[in-house]
């Protein structure tokens, strides 16, 4: 039986005020299993102005097998860090102290811990509440749907036309110039598909004019690509989405533009142009410049330029503001290459840029969200001063691939037409997809969220894949899809569906995953079961507020199975994900449920079940069993709270 451990997280169960202001007093609560220790003292170690301060906690009551300790802290900094100190009732030889433990976001430790992994209160403006409650649906416009007007859009010289049923071309130039003709009205015509899935937010990859199918090489930020139907088509799409209760966010590239961009063309070879300092030119003639990762078609912005800031990100007339206002009414931005924005050698203006964007958005419409693309360790940028959350891979996507994929043929075609024998794994040259256990999954999830404040973590995206990655289904057996999707919708963060995942689509890398949607196959035996799994799990996420706002407590981590609970006063959501058979008995007070009986009590029926699982209560504890390739989710009574 797994031992119960002291627990605290940033949810409302344990933190009295989720959106404090500077100077506010906040009550912090720690849950300790009755009989743990015994403890001589419990203290909170704060770190205001980077100097430790101590607050004694008091034992308030024992409820349902847990002792509750409370302490008050005053919020002195925009990011106010703290951790718990547990002093045991032990004696030691000589003058040595007895046993102590530290509890931070990384877990329970016997030695001192890093400030960066402290729990954190944020006294900065919070994201809209709807962000934590959303289920995101990502659309790559060229590959989603063609409207009846698609044939009327003039094809530019760069585009290589393709039929909707034609395979994606992995080799340049087709890789970036193959054009299927999906447009914004096509998305509008299929909004009811999004409603049938149950998603609540549409995330559009770029819609600005460009010279590629992905449009991350924008030639303007003041227009909508006519290939997509132009501005009027965007207005129609957002209006129809809002009428159905769907939020819509756009995709903005603040790190670079395309080399055809009007600003770059105005500055190229013209040092004295008003746009002359918008980019990193490397010679006096302004004919040589820095491209993003050495790519000459993607010149990098120089955020030292005050005029660039004024036009792009600062104030009511900026690009950032324009698309949040009528008649377009975007509900926020996902910012491409946010991790590199403003960073160039010795210069680091990232903090300034993200804070300016955030202020502009709050001034224009505080009910909008700001998400960053930061695909590796994003913690240092996610401290509440700018981004509300991030598209980041090591805290969820990479570990879920490592645990639940089973790669077969991993070879794929690269951009130059050569064959890479190793499976694509997020651009990491590690020999393919690593073979992780469930323990590895849990460890990575904790490690890469330990330095991110809870309020930001619940706004981070939990994608199985995106337009920049191979598709999960490429290397995962069908029976593992419900397991992976269940983790996406039940762990803290924003579940993400990349359009086509619900159809079971595959793709070897980021370019090959941008597959046209096979409309008309929804009722086919190959697609219908996957669609139904998506609908059931998304419905569970949107119907249970505890999955959006509740705390997280790991109950059992084995080599090939996970058991955890999302908790609030209103409900406990128990989640079991097992790739191999599991039998485990949890302590009686591990969950709020029923009183023990000598004869045992039949378990509740799961709210979702893929595979086979049971939950039973007896005097010995709570016994869980699960067959291989099983996901089971139970909704149980909420946590009993001290009066």
Predicted region positions:
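Substrate-binding/active-site clefts of carbohydrate-active enzymes
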Residues: 140-201, 207-328, 353, 357-365, ...
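Carbohydrate-binding surface patches
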Residues: 16-17, 555-593
């Amino acid at each position: 039986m797994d031992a119960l451990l002291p627990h605290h997280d940033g949810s409302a169960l344990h933190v009295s005020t989720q959106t404090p202001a500077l100077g506010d007093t906040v009550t912090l609560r720690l849950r300790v299993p009755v009989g743990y220790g015994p403890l001589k003292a419990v203290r909170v170690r704060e770190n205001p102005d980077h100097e430790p301060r101590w607050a004694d906690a008091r034992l308030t009551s024992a409820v349902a097998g847990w002792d509750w300790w409370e302490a008050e802290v005053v919020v002195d900094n925009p990011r106010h860090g703290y951790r718990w100190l547990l002093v045991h009732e032990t004696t030691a030889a000589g003058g040595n102290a007895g046993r102590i433990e530290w509890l931070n976001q990384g877990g329970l430790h016997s030695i001192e811990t890093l400030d960066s992994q402290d729990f954190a209160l944020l006294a900065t403006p919070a994201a809209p509440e709807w962000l934590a409650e959303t289920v995101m649906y990502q659309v790559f416009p060229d590959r989603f749907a063609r409207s009846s007007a698609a044939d009327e859009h003039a094809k530019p010289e760069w585009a290589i036309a393709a039929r909707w049923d034609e395979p994606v071309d992995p080799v340049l130039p087709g890789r970036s110039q193959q054009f299927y003709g999906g447009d914004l009205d096509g998305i509008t015509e299929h909004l009811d598909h999004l409603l049938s899935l149950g998603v609540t937010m549409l995330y559009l990859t770029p819609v600005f004019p460009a010279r590629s199918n992905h449009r991350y090489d924008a030639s303007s930020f003041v227009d909508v690509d006519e290939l997509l139907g132009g501005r009027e088509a965007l207005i129609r799409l957002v209006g129809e989405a809002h009428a159905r209760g769907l939020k819509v966010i756009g995709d903005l590239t603040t790190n670079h533009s395309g080399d055809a961009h009007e600003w770059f063309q105005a500055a190229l070879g013209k040092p004295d142009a008003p746009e002359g300092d918008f980019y990193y030119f490397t010679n006096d003639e302004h004919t040589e410049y820095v491209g993003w990762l050495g790519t000459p078609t993607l010149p990098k912005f120089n955020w030292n330029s005050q005029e660039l800031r004024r036009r792009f990100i600062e104030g009511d007339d900026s690009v950032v503001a324009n698309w949040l206002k009528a008649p377009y009414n975007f509900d926020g931005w996902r910012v491409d290459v946010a991790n590199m924005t403003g960073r160039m050698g010795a210069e680091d203006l990232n903090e300034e840029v993200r804070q300016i964007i955030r202020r502009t958005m709050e001034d224009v419409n505080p009910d909008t969200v700001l998400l960053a693309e930061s695909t590796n360790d994003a913690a240092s940028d996610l401290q509440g001063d700018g981004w509300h959350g991030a598209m980041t891979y090591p805290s969820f996507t990479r570990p879920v691939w490592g645990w639940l994929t089973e790669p077969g043929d991993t070879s794929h075609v690269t951009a130059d037409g050569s064959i890479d024998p190793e499976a694509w794994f997020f651009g990491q040259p590690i020999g393919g997809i690593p073979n992780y256990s469930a323990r590895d999954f849990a460890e990575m999830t904790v490690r890469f969220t330990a330095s991110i404040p809870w309020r930001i973590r619940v706004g981070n995206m939990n994608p199985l894949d995106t337009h920049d990655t191979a598709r999960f289904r490429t290397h995962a057996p069908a029976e593992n899809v419900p397991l992976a999707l269940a983790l996406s919708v039940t762990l803290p963060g924003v579940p993400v569906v990349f359009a086509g995942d619900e159809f079971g689509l595959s793709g070897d890398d980021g370019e090959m995953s941008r597959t046209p949607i096979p409309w008309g196959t929804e009722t086919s035996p190959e697609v219908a079961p996957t669609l139904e799994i998506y609908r059931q799990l998304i419905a569970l996420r949107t119907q249970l507020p505890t999955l959006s706002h509740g705390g997280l407590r790991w109950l059992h981590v084995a080599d090939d199975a996970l058991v955890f609970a999302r908790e609030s006063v209103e409900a406990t959501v128990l989640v079991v994900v097992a790739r191999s058979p599991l039998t485990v008995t949890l302590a009686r007070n591990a969950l709020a449920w029923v009183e023990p009986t000598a004869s045992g009590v039949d378990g509740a029926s799961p709210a979702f079940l893929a595979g086979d699982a049971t939950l039973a209560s007896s005097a010995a504890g709570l016994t869980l069993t699960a067959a291989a390739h099983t996901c089971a989710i139970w909704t149980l009574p909420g946590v009993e709270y001290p009066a």
